[in-house]
Amino acid sequence: MQIFVKTLTGKTITLEVESSDTIDNVKSKIQDKEGIPPDQQRLIFAGKQLEDGRTLSDYNIQKESTLHLVLRLRGGGKKRKKKVYTTPKKIKHKHKKVKLAVLSYYKVDAEGKVTKLRRECSNPTCGAGVFLANHKDRLYCGKCHSVYKVNA
């Protein structure tokens, strides 16, 4: 029977084979016509690579079927090294929710009078709601950078 082999250049060659012929036998016939050694040949039929020991009938290759010839690529890709991190990743800060935390900013005396424990900045550029930071010997405004001494 006659089969066609489409080569690397796009040229189609015809081979006279039998259905009992092995793929090795077909590759040697291609070598006789094209000069490509069998160990560099890969034959593809219906999207599958043909293995050397099998016959044409194993792959259901019939008369006037077309095989595709491609070259075998030697070697593989270079193995990449895995990244090794020297420092451990920083753990994200978890917000601790404290129930009724706002009560720590106010004081209620025996008569029921509510007073603020934190002082507001008296500078007119800051406005209401800007509190002073308590330090050991002073009060500090983070907005206008004013410092107030505390008499202790």
Swiss-Prot record:
Keywords recorded for this protein, A-Z: Cytoplasm, Isopeptide bond, Metal-binding, Nucleus, Phosphoprotein, Ribonucleoprotein, Ribosomal protein, Ubl conjugation, Zinc, Zinc-finger
Phosphoserine: modified positions: 122
Effect of residue 48 to R: Deficiency in ubiquitin-protein conjugate formation
Domain of life: Eukaryota
Biological process annotations from GO: cytoplasmic translation; maintenance of translational fidelity; maturation of SSU-rRNA from tricistronic rRNA transcript (SSU-rRNA, LSU-rRNA,5S); modification-dependent protein catabolic process; protein ubiquitination; ribosomal small subunit assembly; ribosome biogenesis
GO molecular function, one term: zinc ion binding
Annotated Ubiquitin-like domain residues: 1-76
Any single GO CC term annotated in Swiss-Prot or TrEMBL for this entry: cytosol
Pfam families reported for this sequence: Ribosomal_S27, ubiquitin
Glycyl lysine isopeptide (Lys-Gly) (interchain with G-Cter in ubiquitin) crosslink site(s): 6, 11, 27, 29, 33, 48, 63, 107, 113
Numbered residues of crosslink Glycyl lysine isopeptide (Gly-Lys) (interchain with K-? in acceptor proteins): 76
CDD domains xrefs: Ubl_ubiquitin
InterPro entries per UniProt: Ribosomal_eS31 (IPR002906), Ribosomal_eS31_euk-type_sf (IPR038582), Ribosomal_zn-bd (IPR011332), Ubiquitin-like_dom (IPR000626), Ubiquitin-like_domsf (IPR029071), Ubiquitin_CS (IPR019954), Ubiquitin_dom (IPR019956), Ubiquitin_ubiquitin-like (IPR050158)
C4-type ZnF: 121-144
Other remarks in the entry: Ubiquitin is encoded by several different genes. UBI1 and UBI2 genes code for a single copy of ubiquitin fused to the ribosomal proteins eL40A and eL40B, respectively. UBI3 is a polyprotein with one copy of ubiquitin fused to ribosomal protein eS31. UBI4 is a polyprotein containing 5 exact head to tail repeats of ubiquitin.
Family: In the N-terminal section; belongs to the ubiquitin family.
Protein name stated in the entry: Ubiquitin-ribosomal protein eS31 fusion protein
Native organism taxonomy: Eukaryota, Fungi, Dikarya, Ascomycota, Saccharomycotina
